[in-house]
């Protein structure tokens, strides 16, 4: 879904064989795979065992946590601090591609990740933060409100919030980073049908609080209804979105 964002950032930063990249919240590893295809050495960090299993299938098909004899590729479950190695060079690029600006507390959560990650990066390293664009330019915003409504019994856990244009800059400032440019990228979400769209959106983790507050069946039903306005005559689902990214530097 966010492939255009990954490509825009990697092109801007000239990610390649000289790059040592740390991917925060790497999920199923697609962004890491794209960096590896450019020759970068990558380390992916996430807390979801299920998503990291998918990342390992993509990047480490032999089942190891690192790929010996090639560009360093590591998958780590835990926090960025768990990826630290005394014998490893500093990272030159740190990415946080999971966009903020849709859930209460997501900016604070990103700040905590950066507190652990920035010390692992070298001076002048690029730190990339991503966020949702304005709600009026993100068709998926209306669907995310469904998650907020269903998660309401948990009061604050995963509650939807509108994005703020200065979200990324504030997070960077709190982390002691120096802004060095930004951009916007169109990332439409397209699915073959409603069921595929529901599965795809649920796999992002954005609806986990809703599932915890209700159940999987209820979330599936509500999501399908919210997606109906975005369904085309041929049955496909199409939701135009715009995402923003900020490039900041480690001083």
Task: Kindly label every feature range from the protein language model.
Residues 1-19:
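Conserved alpha-helix/loop element of class I SAM-dependent methyltransferases that forms part
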Residues 20-22, 28-83:
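Class I SAM-dependent methyltransferase SAM/SAH-binding core
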Residues 28, 169-251:
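Conserved Class I S-adenosyl-L-methionine
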Residues 35, 116-117:
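Class I S-adenosylmethionine-dependent transferase superfamily signal
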Residues 81-94:
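A short acidic, Gly/Pro-enriched loop at the edge of an enzyme's catalytic core
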Residues 96-100, 130:
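Residues lining the SAM
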Residues 102-116:
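A short, conserved alpha-helix within the catalytic core of class I
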Residues 111-112, 118, 122-190:
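Conserved catalytic/acceptor-binding region of the Class I
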